[in-house]
């Protein structure tokens, strides 16, 4: 994994964290410039995630012989354990300590749909969000993984074209009334941006440098700042792709940085568990009449330490053991390495 991309993935996760800080503690109301920035533009961390996901999946499967079902099994082992754990924790809080997450309502049927990545209206009535609200992005991720798995039926050089055509076809189907509105979101095309960056990287089209990539990042951030997400693919998706490309170009300045690499490893757990921690912090703040700044300052290290433990125990050890177990069950074929 490119360390520059790992660093960007960590940064994107924490941008989303502070976006939700503004939501949970301040209902997106802010007086300061930084507060408004996180409230109004912090969601762009998701766009960066999607571009990185397309890049990582493309690079991690190049030159490998793998069956569609094996690819999906790898992704399930990577995504599901931590997601199910934090979804169940959120469900328990909603069911038995609803005052911690008062905008939500518990519904078993909705929980089951959430666990299997099926978009459904949240019982709280605020949109197509799963029980663990941040899991809406994983519904898109699993959809992308499914399309990518199907792409293994064609030759490697045709996979990108296959996925583009499949997405275009699906977009046409998504206009039908029987199709969920969830899949009409243009954000799914940001995975394609990531795959295109993977092609460019493998072919040596992304030249290493420092000043030009920094200028690209600055221009991209200004674009994101000046435009909202009404045309998300253009206003946030394309600048996010340019930011990822610029970080790849600066890889020599990140290479061998173990701390940044580890922060990137922990980013998935940061993303999954941060809303639970923030909600608990908000509850304590309101009950004990504490200053929001004090509680937020306490929540940040709690999220960081919990994410580190989650990565080490669930994403790393549990997934590796599951990989070995499944590999033994599968016989000599084994599993391709997880990414």
Predicted regions and their residues:
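Alpha-helical transmembrane segments in multi-pass integral membrane proteins
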Residues: 1-7, 11-14, 18-38, 58-70, ...
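Membrane-interface helix-loop-helix regions
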Residues: 24, 34-44, 52, 58, ...
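Structured binding elements
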Residues: 49
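Phosphate-coordinating loops and pocket residues in cytosolic domains that bind phosphorylated ligands
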Residues: 73
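Active-site helix-to-loop segments that bind/position phosphate- or nucleotide-bearing substrates
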Residues: 76
């Amino acid at each position: 994994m490119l360390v520059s991309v790992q660093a960007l993935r960590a940064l994107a996760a924490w941008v989303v964290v502070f976006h939700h800080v503004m939501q949970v503690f301040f209902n997106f109301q802010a007086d300061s410039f930084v507060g408004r920035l996180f409230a109004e533009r912090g969601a762009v961390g998701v766009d960066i995630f999607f571009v990185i996901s397309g890049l990582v999946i493309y690079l991690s499967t190049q030159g490998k012989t793998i069956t569609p079902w094996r690819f999906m099994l790898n992704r399930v082992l990577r995504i599901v354990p931590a997601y199910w754990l934090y979804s169940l924790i959120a469900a328990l809080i909603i069911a038995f300590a609803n005052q911690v997450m008062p905008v939500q309502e518990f519904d078993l049927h909705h929980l089951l749909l959430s666990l299997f990545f099926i978009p459904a209206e949240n019982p709280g009535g605020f949109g197509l969000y799963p029980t663990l609200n941040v899991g809406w992005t994983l519904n898109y991720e699993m959809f992308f993984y499914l399309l990518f798995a199907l792409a293994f039926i064609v030759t490697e050089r045709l996979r990108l074209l296959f996925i583009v055509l499949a997405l275009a076809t699906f977009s046409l189907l998504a206009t039908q009334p029987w199709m969920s509105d969830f899949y009409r979101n243009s954000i799914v095309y940001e995975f394609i941006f990531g795959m295109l960056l993977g092609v460019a990287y493998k072919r040596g089209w992304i030249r290493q440098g420092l000043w030009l990539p920094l200028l690209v990042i600055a221009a991209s951030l200004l674009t994101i700042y000046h435009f909202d997400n009404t045309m998300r693919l253009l206003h946030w998706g394309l600048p996010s792709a340019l930011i990822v490309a610029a970080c790849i170009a600066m890889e020599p300045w990140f290479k061998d940085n173990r701390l940044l690499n580890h922060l990137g490893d922990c980013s998935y757990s940061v993303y999954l568990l941060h809303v639970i921690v923030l909600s608990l912090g908000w509850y304590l703040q309101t009950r004990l009449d504490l200053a929001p700044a004090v509680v937020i300052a306490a929540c940040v290290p709690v999220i960081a330490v919990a994410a580190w433990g989650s990565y080490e125990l669930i994403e790393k050890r549990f997934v590796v053991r599951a990989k070995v177990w499944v590999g033994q069950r599968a016989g000599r074929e084994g599993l391709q390495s997880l990414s």
